[in-house]
Design a protein with these regions (language model features):
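Conserved N-terminal ligand/cofactor-binding loop architecture of enzyme catalytic domains
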Residues: 25-105
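Active-site-proximal region of nucleotide-activated glycan assembly enzymes
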Residues: 127-160
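Short, well-ordered alpha-helical microsegments
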Residues: 19, 48, 118-120, 143-145
Length: 160
């Protein structure tokens, strides 16, 4: 007899509503099965609260006041190189900060609906739990370089 329900951890980021809404839609679908426990986590909760709030405010300000700056950063990030070093640094720190939450949830599978949670869990998987099943649901219009992470077992991409 199973000692626990199959646990799905949905991880999203509050950057754009699509990432969160995709996770909520998946949660609603999984919850129809009584044998599945579903937890929806926000990776910004891994930050100290003041940092998460500040980052989100700055991000939203850039989108509204300086969209050209966002476009420039997006293109830089999609080139690889130095941006991948930054991705690894950020995701490594967040994997460390979020490890208590992840251990507490003890998921059988993690589904990331944003590139940052995919990267965080890729590092967590490499460091702590290599057998963890990690999936990415690409919620962007294109597959950004930061989405491509070692350790992601499956990517899901909408076609229409």
């Amino acid at each position: 007899m199973k000692t626990h329900k199959f646990t799905v951890l949905l991880l999203s980021a509050p950057i754009g509503s699509g990432h969160r809404l995709a996770a909520e839609a998946l949660k609603e679908t999984f919850e129809k099965n009584k044998d599945i426990k579903v937890v929806h986590g926000n990776v910004f909760d891994f930050f100290p609260a003041i940092l998460g709030k500040t980052f989100l405010k700055v991000y939203l300000w850039i989108l509204g006041a300086c969209p050209w700056l966002y476009e420039m950063m997006y293109k830089w990030g999609n080139r690889g190189g130095g941006s991948l070093w930054m991705r690894e640094f950020i995701n490594g720190a967040l994997a460390y900060l979020g490890s208590g939450f992840i251990k507490k949830v003890n998921p059988d599978v993690v589904i990331a609906t944003h590139a940052t949670p995919a990267g965080i869990m890729s590092i967590y998987k490499r460091r702590k739990q290599s057998s963890l099943c990690l999936c990415g649901v690409v919620t962007d219009y294109t597959v950004h370089t930061w989405w491509i992470c070692d350790g992601v077992d499956t990517y899901f991409i909408a076609d229409e």
